[in-house]
Amino acid sequence: KIAIRVLRDYNCIPDKGYDIIISSNIPINSGLSSSSALIIAWINFLLNTFSTHKVSAELLAEISYRIEVIEIGNSGGKMDQYTISFGKTIFLDTLEDKVTPYDHDLCDMIIGVSNQEKDTEGLLKKLKTNALISIDLVKKKFPKFDIYNPLSYELEKFLAELDEELRPYFRAAIGNYKITLNAQNEFNKSFLNIEKISKLMSEHH
């Protein structure tokens, strides 16, 4: 219902129904972006069926982000929506929503499913909230700090100003950004070193 309401802004108004069957071997509620994939597929179908709007990867990403994060209030960022909409491997500059696509051959990945229920949304909300709180506190104390500029990092000094419970979240935010920059550097090379990428993925996880 939310998707249909949002799509009215794009002059997409369904006037008849369809019987749709969706099947997949991707486990749900496992942090594999299955909800984003479904929303993007749904938006793509509706736009192509009930509107004359030109459908692009950028448009699908923007609308799905609006639905999932702004309208529904989920705590994720933009990476799921943009990666699924564009396909393959991308680097997303979240400040400008600029996408850099890559066409490297990646190795196969093995996904282990524990079948244990988990609160993915609750976990994301906790991580995001505490990371933003810690970053904001450091910025207030050290105005020159810029998380997008590693040269401004004085980690030990920053950590000393935070409560112990917030330190892991700030350390993770800093560490994850460095990992992202290192991964971008590797993907910008003509030859992709799978071992280095695998190591960075493990560090990030």
Question: What are these model-predicted stretches?
Answer:
Residues 1-104:
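Gly/Ser-rich oxyanion-binding loop with an adjacent helix/lid
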Residues 83, 88-205:
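C-terminal nucleotide
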